[in-house]
């Protein structure tokens, strides 16, 4: 008997599939894993020896193994041997054959069998006979069905459809600007979406898109009912027409649907701090609050009235016309105006999307809400003015009968009634005539009370709105009232009062802000951006700041304080201790000295910076010529920032020494600090290069100021005396001791014009000043003063050379950003000495100014003694310079 039609192979165990216990040892590789030769047609397998029951010894192949090389054999090997026991595809293939066979006519494996209890009931199978007839092989549909079932055995169609997923997303809050602002982050929005999913079926989030569109639709129906229903009740007798019935049916249906949806919509508690999504809590909360009002306003009174109307004859209907008052239950829909708050929240969402300001949005919404409420009350009052006489069958002393308007059209009646109501509410009259009946008198008083209340609310809201739109001006006015009371209390003269008034006008310009509080509430990056935008250009005009670290400049900007000075005010006075430096944002100041010499400084200039380091006394006075808006920087804040940037402190000190040297003064404190840093080896190559560039650009700035304005605070200095080579060598040695990297002499037109500096004569022929002949012609004003001038591209037309470090952007050193410093009017202005125009061509870069040792060794107008014999007699120049510097300190 063929094994395919029999009940099973002799000796084969019914449970051929391993149980989910410890897996048996892997059997030897089956022959189908080796590439078999093309087999001949397989003969029908006859009964053979039974395969062993022990899994490790299951090496004998069944008769159908001869077909493994064919197409169905390859397909079966891909499907894990057609569900043979012990293969992964057994479960899926066992149910893939419609005739009870495993894909190609083999007996299917069914549960139960002797080996089942030993290996587990879920995976033990027994072979049962197949139905008669040929069995088709496994087709693509069977394989697709097997794969669709999945490893977890999920049935087809278990996932939600696309439409269901889309509708479910409408019930959840979307990821948009409004949701992100309400919940804080996208992660919080996703958590809220998970809350909606876990809350139950058909739970609507109050911030979902579905609820938004539904509320907007209900708002339209609500406005329509609040306007149309009073008109229909009052001015129309026949309410059984088709349009009226359709409107009532549609509106009542939507109100009932809204009543049901409110039981499934989350409730926002305590200013959006908590959202209730539990169905039980939603139901209890809604029943305790707005359910009664919504239910009463949603009762289909129209249907009940139409049903009752058909059973009443005409006579009874005339007497029952007063039942129309029942339609006033729709007026309870007025309480639905409280849902306008939800509309306002979504209007805010639209405003944020279109980048509208909050003040404009709140102003528009408050005005629109107030005007809409007043118009709605006027509409209701007009309907009430005609409804009461109508219910009384138009007595002779009512305003309708007096004017003979009983049979007029409803539009004329409504117009006169609305005019009468608005006259009462605005308290401007009684309409066409004064009330005569007692009913009209009471209606008039009621209208006046409602109108006065609305008028007061409108005035209050409008006043608060105007104040909120310009709170800074209101704050300024309140502050100035206090100032006026102060001046009156102290009986100040009229000129003082006018001066104080002008100061407040220019200082605050009609608006007062608490700038410190506003900036203090912002985060650090935003505050720095605002400060940089307001005044960084002013500070960047300084060479020290232009070549400084941007972080240092930002730290300095946060310490600035805004001040305003009037014409004639002395900002600083000569002889006082300097505690501030100033940056001019707008205005003109004059720098005055004892010699009555003036120098004008305007927008972008600065003065008083040397005193930040020395805390010395002012050498000049600064007076405001116009209204000046300045930024001040105190010495304490300046030093606080310099503690974090020691290199910038050394740069400030070096520039201060150079400036003092140019005006013929010195400061022992700064000299001691620089000498200490020099001896301790604090200066490195990069810092020294940065400081050299700062000093160079500071000198070039003074040079450009001298070219543009020859008038200074002092007369032109005398020409520098002739010097010997020994003194020049000492000067170079002193410069090398201050900065070891500098091995070339200091040259420059400014240094030649200084009475304290000496110059080594250029090699070659003697300068023209020493010859008895006429002096050489001066350079034209537009020509560069020296070969170094063409390289100073920030002031010329050539490109600037790259600076020594990454913190030295040459583009910041433009001529426009180099205003004159107020500490430099003390510099000797005037035409440079004769040697300035005959300066030799040299490629050396100007370095720091001469050290105090060089100044001590060099002859000057202040010191007429000769050079030190030690310096001229061949002593070490560096030792001589350092010894003299120590003696000066």
UniProtKB/Swiss-Prot annotation:
Activity regulation details: Activated by cAMP, and at 10-100 times higher concentrations, also by cGMP. cAMP binding causes a conformation change that leads to the assembly of an active tetramer and channel opening. Binding of cAMP removes a tonic inhibition conferred by cyclic nucleotide-binding domain (CNBD) on channel opening. Channel activity is modulated by intracellular chloride ions and pH; acidic pH shifts the activation to more negative voltages. Inhibited by extracellular cesium ions.
Compartments (UniProt record): Cell membrane
Biased composition (Pro residues): 17-55, 760-784
Residue intervals on the Cytoplasmic side: 1-215, 262-288, 339-369, 462-889
GO biological process, one term: sodium ion transmembrane transport
Region of interest (Involved in subunit assembly), ranges: 158-209
Binding residues for 3',5'-cyclic AMP: 599, 608-611, 618-619, 659
UniProt keyword annotations, A-Z: Ammonia transport, cAMP, cAMP-binding, Cell membrane, Disease variant, Epilepsy, Glycoprotein, Ion channel, Ion transport, Ligand-gated ion channel, Lipoprotein, Membrane, Methylation, Nucleotide-binding, Palmitate, Phosphoprotein, Potassium, Potassium channel, Potassium transport, Sodium, Sodium channel, Sodium transport, Transmembrane, Transmembrane helix, Transport, Voltage-gated channel
Domain of life: Eukaryota
Extracellular side: 237-240, 310-317, 391-413, 436-440
Outcome, altering residue 246 to M: In EIG17; gain-of-function variant; affects channel activity resulting in a depolarizing shift in activation and faster activation kinetics compared to controls
Ranges annotated as biased composition (Gly residues): 1-10
Disordered: annotated segments: 1-159, 754-889
Pfam families: cNMP_binding (PF00027), Ion_trans (PF00520), Ion_trans_N (PF08412)
Intramembrane region ranges (chain numbering): 414-435
Topology within the bilayer: Multi-pass membrane protein
Record-listed Phosphoserine modification sites: 146, 161, 668, 754, 771, 779, 786, 866, 868
Keyword Transport: yes
List of glycosylated residues: 407
Protein name, UniProt field: Potassium/sodium hyperpolarization-activated cyclic nucleotide-gated channel 2
Species annotation: Homo sapiens (Human)
